[in-house]
Amino acid sequence: KRIWDGQDNVLEIGPFLGGSTRAIALGMMLNPNKKNLARVYTYDRFGKYHKPEELLHFLAPMFERGILGETEKQFILKNNSFLEVFDIIHRQFEYYRMIVPQRAILNDIPPDQDSDNEASFRFEQDQVTPFNLPEELTYSAVFVDGCKSWYGTKQFMQITLPKTSKGCYYIFQDYGTHTCFWLPVFLQVFNKYFKLVAFVDHTYTFELVEELSQETISKNFPDSPADIPRSEYELLFKKLQASAINFNDTYSVLNYQLQYAGLLGYLGYRDEARSLIVKQLNSPFALTHRQWILRALEWSTYDSQGNNIDLFLPKEI
């Protein structure tokens, strides 16, 4: 009741197989203020994250329990899609009436910068509809787990913000993931519009405290990370760290360092990025987060095509 007022719909992007979607729908059903027509609209490309064999391995427990059968197996092998699997998993439960799954994709680079219209998406093109929202719907809670790129985040927020009002909560499930530096950058650039209200593990919840226009986003958040001066990033991440200290959020004090290193690597400063991450191994953070730091050293972030930014590659001449 404190996060969702029950009056508008809930929006989710990136549900995968719907674990979070299920929790959202169950919570909505328990809210006494829920309007009858309120639903959770969940968007995903519902396919091609994994090779079919990998997806089948991930789903093995459901095959063993009889939830999925040979028909679903053959469908996955043939189509590399899991929307039908999503439906089978949830349709037997009452909460599924609250869920409206939709196929859609976000661009990872601006379409007008892509001469062959193939690199706009991290995965090969298919017939999935580009992400958009129905004109008649509004939302008062937004769960974000599908903004896996800088431009995709910009596109999502430009489309979504006009459908939400002050008081809407945005729940960013990848905010604390070291690869996704664009999320804290976006929220810090527009920090007067968003107020941090809660965080658990990697998930950070912000309240929209002032309406943010598409024009303001276009003016202040460019299409590429390379279009912001490095000096601005240095100041931005210092402010983020200061905020984390004020919240006694020791994990983010470390993670902002890892995200800044990922950004440096993305911009081509690989030696500096590597040194910054290695430095964390000699800090007190390594006592509790050593594996997380080593993971960042191995996979600091990725480019718009989904390729790892390898911090151990020699500089290009």
Task: Describe the residue ranges of each PLM region.
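S-adenosylmethionine/decaboxylated-SAM
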Residues: 3-313
